[in-house]
Swiss-Prot record:
This is UDP-N-acetylmuramoylalanine--D-glutamate ligase. The keyword ATP-binding applies. It is found in: Cytoplasm. The keyword Metal-binding does not apply. It catalyses: UDP-N-acetyl-alpha-D-muramoyl-L-alanine + D-glutamate + ATP = UDP-N-acetyl-alpha-D-muramoyl-L-alanyl-D-glutamate + ADP + phosphate + H(+). Belongs to the MurCDEF family. Keywords: ATP-binding, Cell cycle, Cell division, Cell shape, Cell wall biogenesis/degradation, Cytoplasm, Ligase, Nucleotide-binding, Peptidoglycan synthesis. One of its GO terms (molecular function) is UDP-N-acetylmuramoylalanine-D-glutamate ligase activity. Cell wall formation. Catalyzes the addition of glutamate to the nucleotide precursor UDP-N-acetylmuramoyl-L-alanine (UMA). Its EC number is 6.3.2.9. Pathway: Cell wall biogenesis; peptidoglycan biosynthesis.
């Protein structure tokens, strides 16, 4: 839809979180007539913003008024299966996401990043690369989306010269229909959010694939060729309508087929584009205590591939990659206390993210895990846990499930709070060992979000010292 088509139209916004309030503001500035409806309570901050914008709203349920609309914008935390959204569909009212809405207004080049793991790190690193290039060439880079800043709040300040780096969750992509990123990145697909997708990895992957549904000539799709689900999806005989760039950790596995790729050979990042190969920099120039492990090498390759597709100079990438120290709450060293190394990996909200953390931390660790379960299957990491973990401290709503899953694999103790978990970890850890806080679950049972969870963990570690 074109922005001018919204003028004078009633648009219902479902959900009063950051993205919902920002979407309402964008609609109001476009001359539409937004109405926001929140099933729960609207926060005082959101209510004040809506009043300032002149946007009417309701809370404590959805009235008939929400259906008196030409368009519905749904917040990412609201499934398509809830009654209000099902009724929207039944009445023929188009339902789109805040990402879709904001994209109608976006003059900037869009780089979209999705996947089960690595989205935030890749988006953060890529944004820093693009921002550094922008300082040289006179454009701005914006970091928006699932990273915490609504796309719709920033899009009014963008120009055609700028780059918008979007971290995109499956929830945000579900209701995207005309969204067309110039460059799309798929980091990996492993089971996650199975509670939302009825236990179907296929349904979850389908939501992720919406990132390239509207891509065409002139666009680029970058994917992890080492991921079996993505490889099966993209390796087909008929050509895709967009440029395809593969990435992987072994150049020899990619060099057997034509096409562009980014990989590693003899300890160096290598890039093949338009038939020629270039060596960018050594891997050991990138890896450091806050940015280590195979998964972060994939994140670096994804960022390099996307930056090259956006026309960023290799020297800009080298400078940013050499100085990048990682992202908060992602295998972040929280401190050394009581003779132990405490690692904050609060962003690990899936089993695969936990697997990556376990592979990066020395054996003999104590693992603190648990939270609100998302349909997790822990059997796939049982052997790795047996090899690497001396004791698990299970917390949150899923603590009993975790205890049952690892019974006979490694000792498990349960904690009623994060503070108790930290104390139990201290008691059960051997001198010099690591304590890894990698929940593999969402945070909403005990915390506001994963950031709140990670900061509370770091505060508890500071108190130990």
């Amino acid at each position: 839809m074109k922005p001018e088509e919204l003028k004078g139209k009633v648009a219902s916004v479902i959900g009063a979180g950051k993205s919902g309030v920002s979407a309402a503001g964008l609609l109001a500035r476009a001359g539409a007539r937004p109405f926001l409806s929140e099933f729960g309570a609207v926060s005082p901050e959101a209510a004040a913003t809506l009043r300032q914008l002149g946007v009417p709203f309701e809370e404590g349920g959805h009235s008939e008024r929400v259906f008196e609309a030409a368009l519905c914008i749904v917040s990412p935390g609201i499934p398509q299966t809830v009654p209000v959204i099902r009724e929207m569909h039944a009445r023929g009212i188009p339902v789109v996401s805040e990402i879709e809405l904001a994209s109608w207004f976006c003059p900037a080049r869009i780089i979209g990043i999705t996947g089960t793991d690595g989205k935030t790190t890749t988006a953060t690193l890529l944004h820093r690369i693009c921002a550094a290039e922008g300082e040289r060439k006179g454009f701005r880079a914006f970091s928006v989306g699932n990273i915490g800043i609504p796309f719709s709040s920033e899009v009014p300040g963008m120009t055609a010269a700028d780059i918008a780096v979007l971290e995109l969750s499956s929830y945000q992509l579900e209701a995207c229909f005309d969204f067309r990123p110039n460059i799309a990145v798929l980091t990996n697909v492993t089971p996650d959010h199975m509670d939302r997708y009825g236990g179907s990895i296929e349904a979850y992957a389908t939501a992720k694939y919406r990132i390239h549904a509207r891509q065409g000539a002139g666009d680029t799709l970058i994917y992890n060729h080492d991921d079996p689900i993505l490889r099966a999806h993209f390796d087909r005989s008929e050509p895709w309508p967009f440029r395809l760039v593969r990435l992987g950790l072994r150049a020899e596995t990619l060099d057997v087929a034509p096409g562009d790729f980014v990989s590693v050979e003899d300890g160096e990042i290598v890039v093949r584009a338009s038939g020629s190969t270039e060596r960018l920099m050594r891997v050991d120039e990138i890896m450091k205590p806050g940015f280590r492990g195979e998964h972060n090498l994939y994140n670096a390759l994804s960022s390099v591939a996307a930056a090259l597709a956006a026309g960023v100079a290799p020297e800009t990438m080298r400078g940013v990659l050499a100085g990048f120290g990682g992202v908060e709450h992602r295998q972040e060293l929280a401190g050394n206390a009581c003779g132990l190394n405490w690692i904050n990996d609060s962003k690990a909200t899936s089993v695969n993210a936990l697997r990556q953390a376990l592979q990066s931390v020395p054996a003999g660790m104590v693992l603190i895990a648990g939270g609100r379960d998302k349909g997790n299957d822990y059997s796939a990491i049982a052997d790795l846990v047996r090899e690497k973990v001396a004791c698990i401290v299970a917390i949150g709503e899923s603590r009993r499930k975790i205890a049952d899953a690892f019974r006979g694999v490694t000792p498990v103790v349960e904690a009623a709070s994060l503070a108790e978990a930290v104390e139990l970890a201290r008691q059960n850890a051997r001198p010099g060992a690591s304590v890894l806080f990698s929940p593999a679950c969402s945070s909403f049972d005990m915390f506001r979000d994963f950031e709140d969870r990670g900061r509370q963990f770091k505060q508890l570690v500071r108190e130990l010292t």
